[in-house]
Design a protein with these regions (language model features):
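Extracytoplasmic cell-surface/polysaccharide-interacting catalytic and binding patches
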Residues: 1-243
Length: 243
């Protein structure tokens, strides 16, 4: 399968959101810091945090799922830079303590976790979700639990059939030859907001930002690694989320 056609630097006016409220993300009214998790976005939710339009759409989607016996529960939503950095440091310390080299530890981390400042969860448009109406134990964000006899298989099937109606799209698909983060059947993004935000994010000097941050292991972020991370981890996603 051919590689995803990566987004071009288009203006916000090129983003078509005809099926949704005209509340598309307006970067002129938003601090650039919000794109990298260092701002203070206005968020809504009880036990989770999303931007208003994404929150309203989620509430409608959750209500529709309830009618089918599915109780959508948000495991993760908005995460600021500090939160993402805690995740990064915890994993980096654990993997290097287990004997992995710094480079191998970083490679293992970015199978599922983002480098602080690059997470879609910084935007308050993305959610990790499960079904609370089932019996489960242990780690919940595991692909096999969303397939076959897994406790969240019914949720996955319902989302595949209905989530797009509410503006939510899976981010990291199981598409053949897709690179970057591994398949995450639990991670959905509210496209009417996240698409234009990604367009604006692309305009930032991501390479310069990553090289300037003093993260654990960041001395190994050479130009080749950063270019690959941007191309594969940030941009090789569901084409429906690309402008």
């Amino acid at each position: 399968m051919n590689r995803t056609n990566f987004i071009k630097l288009l203006g916000l006016g090129s983003v078509a959101l005809h099926s949704f409220p005209s509340m598309a993300f307006n970067t002129r009214n938003t601090d650039t810091l919000e794109l990298i998790g260092k701002g203070n976005p206005t968020v809504f939710g009880n036990g989770f945090s999303l931007r208003k339009e994404a929150y309203d759409a989620f509430v409608k989607m959750r209500a529709a799922a309830e009618k089918e016996g599915i109780s959508i529960h948000v495991v993760s939503s908005y995460r600021n830079y500090a939160h993402q950095n805690r995740i990064w440091e915890r994993k980096y310390k654990r993997f290097t303590k287990q004997g992995l080299s710094p480079i191998k530890a970083i490679e293992k981390i970015i199978a599922y976790s983002t480098i602080p400042g690059t997470s879609r969860h910084h935007w308050a448009t993305d959610i990790d979700i499960i079904d609370k109406n089932t019996t489960y134990s242990g780690d919940v964000l595991v692909p096999r639990k969303f397939h076959g006899d897994g406790p969240f298989c019914k949720l996955r099937e319902w989302l595949e059939a209905n989530a797009n109606t509410y503006g939510f799209y899976i981010v990291y698909t199981d598409r053949a030859n897709r690179k970057g983060f591994k398949y995450e059947p639990w991670h959905y993004s509210y496209a009417p907001l996240s698409k234009p935000m990604l367009t604006e994010y692309r305009k930032l000097d991501i390479k310069k930002m990553l090289q300037a941050e003093k993260l654990m292991g960041s001395e190994h972020f050479n130009e080749k690694f950063i270019n690959s991370y941007i191309k594969e981890n940030i941009l090789d996603i569901n084409p429906e989320l690309l402008s």
